[in-house]
């Protein structure tokens, strides 16, 4: 996977920037204001992997021509047993470089311009090493410049020369010369670019065009191209039989016309080639087909769907192919720009649930978004917050399992302000999704619980009604967060109580240090605690502020032991 990327003079980014993307998770979000550079990151990977044109930052023309060059340098984290042995020596050099890199590694004093990417990279690697045992992984910071030559960004400095011990003529000003970088790392670079497949789905994509079977993106999702599919269905023997029959017909005409014959130019007569047959089949069979969605009245072409339905269809198609068709997605990285675009607020949560499931079937899923409601609900994921201050970009990477604690810590320590979006919008967007989805004609029902283990158990016991009752089970990270969500729902309830059709149930454990708060008697919103009765051996649901506060009870204390052991 890609855990981060160095960007220099690419689209929104001037100078050198390091953007951390993951500390081990395959579900990676990018948040920030419009125009701040979220989609630039996804575009850069399209240029790197797929050869799309580079969108060069205009500041490059003003920079020093002696050192300025645009580059894209992803930082890969790859299991050692997944990289061919012949690349291990080079990968070991780069892993040493990444792990040992510190403020002295560049070899020159850091300036206000060069310090931020260096510090961000160092802090990111420290965080990664806390989260992941890197014993079985290579960390490979390796990319290319505009001309396609291998590039190591700011990591090309004193530490690199110490590690690989180059000859004197390979070094200039304490750095490896471009020719030396190419000599040492170009072959590994080409392998990485070919090994991984990258699909970029921009916000303004035409869903009708994107979902056609002949597009490269759909074929990447399927894990095979149309030529391979046709070859499997129409083997060479059939094409040979067609040629034999057609040549027999031409020979018959030649006999009938005596001194005339239908021939191709030259002495060698051309037969129908395999590629000719494939192209005919693609044109006459596949190209005329469009994606249709089945509903109660029949089939509807994607062009006739609403904007929100089109956006949903793209994610549904990706998930369907990855889950049911492609053999595995180990080499596939997907970048999606604003997957919530055009969706009603009530549909955002389900869209991001689909995204999360999709991330489990590919190597990595990176997305940009303005909807923060997924932050409290995802246990295994990362989100990078991007802010700009005085034309300089700042990046903060959060692990979603504990992002609230990280925010509190950074708020106390950071010189820069933590963006309010992260602190407020994550909960507010989730509340809006819950309320709006309960107002629909076919409403959702919600079960809010403390953590991911509760969700795991509850999903098993309630599996029969998850689909039939449109039940969504959401872990929010502890009793305090359950309380916060209840109080926000309670405040909003009066405005919508006549129209609410769905139900919201908030469930907490009974902890030793009980978190008690008053709970109003609201018909469609209930807030309860689980508690065991040691006398009757029955688990009860009591109000949060009930006087029954012992024994302390967690969901594990209430499970059916036979089901649990199975």
Region roles according to the model:
Residues 1-56, 290-430, 435:
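Switch/communication elements of ASCE P-loop NTPase nucleotide-binding domains
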Residues 1-220, 458:
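P-loop NTPase switch/coupling surface
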Residues 49, 81, 207-208, 454, ...:
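Short acidic, S/G/P-rich loop/turn micro-motifs used as interaction or catalytic elements
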Residues 82-86, 151-152, 209-211, 374-377, ...:
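Switch/connector loops and helix/strand junctions flanking conserved nucleotide-binding motifs
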Residues 195-199, 203-333:
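Extended helical coiled-coil dimerization/tether regions that scaffold
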Residues 197-199, 332-334, 445-447, 471-472, ...:
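Hydrophobic beta-strand segments of well-ordered beta-sheets in folded domains
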Residues 373-505:
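RecA-like P-loop NTPase motor core
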Residues 507-566:
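Activity-critical C-terminal alpha-helical subdomain
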């Amino acid at each position: 996977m890609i855990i981060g990327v160095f960007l220099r003079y690419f689209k929104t980014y001037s100078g050198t920037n390091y953007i951390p993307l993951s500390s081990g998770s395959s579900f990676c979000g990018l948040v920030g204001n419009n125009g701040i550079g979220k989609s630039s990151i996804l575009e850069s990977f399209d240029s790197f992997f797929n050869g799309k044109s580079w969108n060069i930052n205009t500041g490059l023309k003003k920079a020093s021509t002696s050192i300025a060059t645009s580059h894209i340098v992803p930082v890969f984290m790859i299991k050692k047993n997944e990289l061919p042995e012949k690349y291990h020596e080079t990968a070991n050099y780069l892993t040493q470089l990444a792990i040992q890199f510190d403020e002295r590694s560049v070899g020159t004093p850091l300036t206000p311009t060069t310090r931020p990417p260096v510090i961000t990279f160092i802090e990111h690697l420290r965080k990664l090493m806390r989260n992941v045992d890197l014993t079985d992984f290579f960390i490979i910071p390796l990319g290319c410049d505009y001309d396609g030559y291998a590039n190591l960004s700011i990591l090309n400095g004193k530490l690199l020369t110490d590690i690989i011990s180059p000859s004197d003529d390979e070094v200039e000003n304490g750095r490896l010369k471009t020719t030396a970088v190419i000599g040492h790392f170009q072959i590994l670079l080409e392998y990485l670019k070919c090994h991984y497949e990258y699909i970029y789905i921009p916000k303004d994509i035409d869903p009708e065009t994107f979902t056609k079977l002949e597009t490269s993106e759909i074929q990447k999702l399927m894990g095979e191209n149309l030529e391979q599919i046709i070859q499997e269905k129409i083997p060479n023997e059939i094409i040979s039989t067609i040629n034999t029959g057609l040549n027999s017909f031409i020979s018959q005409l030649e006999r009938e016309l005596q001194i005339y014959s239908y021939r191709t130019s030259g002495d060698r007569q051309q037969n129908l080639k395999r590629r000719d047959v494939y192209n005919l089949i693609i044109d006459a069979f596949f190209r005329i087909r469009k994606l249709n969605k089945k509903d109660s009245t029949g089939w509807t072409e994607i062009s006739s769907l609403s904007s929100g339905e089109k956006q949903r269809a793209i994610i549904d198609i990706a998930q369907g192919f990855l889950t049911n068709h492609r053999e595995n997605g180990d080499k596939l990285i997907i970048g999606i720009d604003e997957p919530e675009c055009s969706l009603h607020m009530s549909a955002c949560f389900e869209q991001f649930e689909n995204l999360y499931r999709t991330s489990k079937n590919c190597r990595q899923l990176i997305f940009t978004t303005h909807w923060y409601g997924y932050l409290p609900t995802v246990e295994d994921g990362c989100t990078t917050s991007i802010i700009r201050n005085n034309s300089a970009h700042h990046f903060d990477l959060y692990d979603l399992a504990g992002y609230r604690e990280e925010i509190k810590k950074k708020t106390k320590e950071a010189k820069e302000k933590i963006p309010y979006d992260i602190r407020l919008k994550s909960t507010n967007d989730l509340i809006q999704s819950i309320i709006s989805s309960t107002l629909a004609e076919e409403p959702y029902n919600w079960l809010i619980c403390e953590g991911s283990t509760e969700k795991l158990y509850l999903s098993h016991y309630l599996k029969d009604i998850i689909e039939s009752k449109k039940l969504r089970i959401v872990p929010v990270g502890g009793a305090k967060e359950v309380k916060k969500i209840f109080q926000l729902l309670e405040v909003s309830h009066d405005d919508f109580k006549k129209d609410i059709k769905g139900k919201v149930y908030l469930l907490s454990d009974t902890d030793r240090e009980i978190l008690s708060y008053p709970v109003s008697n609201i018909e469609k919103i209930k807030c309860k605690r689980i508690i065991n009765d040691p006398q009757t051996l029955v688990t009860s649901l009591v109000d949060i502020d009930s006087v029954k506060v012992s024994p302390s009870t967690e969901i594990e204390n209430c499970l059916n032991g036979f089901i649990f052991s199975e």
